[in-house]
Amino acid sequence: MLLPCALLAALLAAGHAANPCCSLPCQNRGVCMTTGFDRYECDCTRTGYYGENCTTPEFFTWLKLILKPTPNTVHYILTHFKGVWNIINNISFLRDTIMRYVLTSRSHLIDSPPTYNSDYSYKSWEAYSNLSYYTRSLPPVGHDCPTPMGVKGKKELPDSKLIVEKFLLRRKFIPDPQGTNVMFTFFAQHFTHQFFKTDHKKGPGFTKAYGHGVDLNHIYGETLERQLKLRLRKDGKLKYQMIDGEMYPPTVKDTQAEMIYPPHVPEHLQFSVGQEVFGLVPGLMMYATIWLREHNRVCDVLKQEHPEWDDEQLFQTTRLILIGETIKIVIEDYVQHLSGYHFKLKFDPELLFNQRFQYQNRIAAEFNTLYHWHPLLPDTFQIHNQEYTFQQFLYNNSIMLEHGLSHMVKSFSKQSAGRVAGGKNVPAAVQKVAKASIDQSRQMRYQSLNEYRKRFMLKPFKSFEELTGEKEMAAELEELYGDIDAMELYPGLLVEKPRPGAIFGETMVEIGAPFSLKGLMGNTICSPEYWKPSTFGGKVGFEIINTASLQKLICNNVKGCPFTAFHVLNPEPTEATINVSTSNTAMEDINPTLLLKEQSAEL
């Protein structure tokens, strides 16, 4: 009697094992909901589609699909016909109309309010209200699904170390054909680590950056306690020290604001700033120093305009101005460079005042993952007339004092960064960080690359060859994954065929741009109630934001106003390069991969 009962129980368990939503049947952003153990229902509400799996377009959806050009066609138009775009850029009405469309079409792809997180694959108050989570643009794959990608692919994913070594690890440095430089590389790291701050004690789905956007906590500290330690408490300024007549961050001893430094770093080189990991490399501390100087400079401007204001009002208003400067620089310099567009992007919050737009943001785990642009890093770092290896560069703030910011800016502006897409360009020094990106994606149960492409209105790849644009890697990937619909998001982004002459492939741009623009324009200062001169101390403060640029930031805060940009500048042929890789320094005994641990896993 026991045997038939056990058999029946096993059959029932087997019958209940596979969640019908594991096959991801609902298309076009339809929501899959189970109705019993073996049935599902697709909610097609407001998708523009109908039918059992939300696959039949409504009339206007069909018309839109017929008329809408592909993302690659749009990209081609925007990156060619320079003469036409020069005319459009000088006609305000046309430029504003196109910019408004760019902002709305991109940002409307982001769910706002947020919907899912790594623990909730369905809408819940917890997923909406708990700021300690990163949100998710697609729900995690169910624990009870037959394969890690739902029903597609093999039951076990290939070894992540093998994926890194076979497809991601650099053999020879591949420069970015778009001309991106190291100045851009460190700006990207510095800027994004105000909102990419994974709480590794809780898990990869959690964040310590509760502001979920551009709040400059990497300058001012994540908590009020840290902020107060960094503040001078006079004239709104941040604490600083003067070295050889120039302003630098204070030391940890001066602020008592803890930073992450190895024990060997001398006390006088333990600079203290808002983000505790920014002592990792001098490039990050360079930008931290520039923004420290900019904050204190703007405080002086406001103090002159408002001698009646106390320390708190000067500090808070300056912070809002620097948030505005940051967003302006990111859109008009940083995103402009990445896009490669001849169309001139514009930061103007008023473009959205008559649009359906929510002034809130929640950082997505997928956005954090795709931003792991380790291929940008060069093999060595060239500053003035010297060359530093990773070992010599890590936790070495003496480089900044030895060369000064002017030489660092000049040198980083001339040095080429690496191409991100196309595979095989992650430096060996950070291969463990790339492996961690894959492992954490698996822990959070990301859906496949193709599911993310569909989520962001892209056609899924039909083969590995279509993904990579070549045969060798494609064949090896097919052998390991078995099915293109089982290809993982992060490795897929890095091995994808780059667009012609570009740093990224199609997927990175079409997924990353919506997250980026929604996060920037969804900032509180861009809302109608905030975007007015009085918020920023009057016309003078408003003017600082509206005229901000990377070059102006450097000119106002770096001695000699060195010329800079986010693309490679022609080197001056008069300077010889000395390789210091054989010199005896305290940094030689450091293993860089040991230093790139949890606290810096996103750097």
From Swiss-Prot:
Reaction catalysis annotation: (5Z,8Z,11Z,14Z)-eicosatetraenoate + AH2 + 2 O2 = prostaglandin H2 + A + H2O; (9Z,12Z)-octadecadienoate + AH2 + O2 = (9R)-hydroxy-(10E,12Z)-octadecadienoate + A + H2O; (9Z,12Z)-octadecadienoate + AH2 + O2 = (9S)-hydroxy-(10E,12Z)-octadecadienoate + A + H2O; (9Z,12Z)-octadecadienoate + AH2 + O2 = (13S)-hydroxy-(9Z,11E)-octadecadienoate + A + H2O
Residues involved in heme b binding: H374
UniProt signal peptide: 1-17
Record-linked Gene3D superfamilies: Haem peroxidase domain superfamily, animal type, Laminin
Highest taxon of source: Eukaryota
Cofactor note: Binds 1 heme b (iron(II)-protoporphyrin IX) group per subunit.
Residue ranges of domain EGF-like in the record: 18-55
Membrane topology, record value: Peripheral membrane protein
Keyword set, alphabetical order: Dioxygenase, Disulfide bond, Endoplasmic reticulum, Fatty acid biosynthesis, Fatty acid metabolism, Glycoprotein, Heme, Iron, Lipid biosynthesis, Lipid metabolism, Membrane, Metal-binding, Microsome, Oxidoreductase, Peroxidase, Prostaglandin biosynthesis, Prostaglandin metabolism, Signal
Site (Aspirin-acetylated serine): S516
Keyword Glycoprotein: yes
Transmembrane segments: none
InterPro entries: EGF-like_dom (IPR000742), Haem_peroxidase_animal (IPR019791), Haem_peroxidase_sf (IPR010255), Haem_peroxidase_sf_animal (IPR037120), Oxylipin_biosynth_metab (IPR050783)
Disulfide bonds: C21-C32, C22-C145, C26-C42, C44-C54, C555-C561
Names of the cofactor(s): heme b
Entry-linked Pfam families: An_peroxidase (PF03098)
UniProt binding sites for substrate: R106, Y341
Cellular location(s): Microsome membrane; Endoplasmic reticulum membrane
Family of this protein: Belongs to the prostaglandin G/H synthase family.
Protein name: Prostaglandin G/H synthase 2
Gene: PTGS2
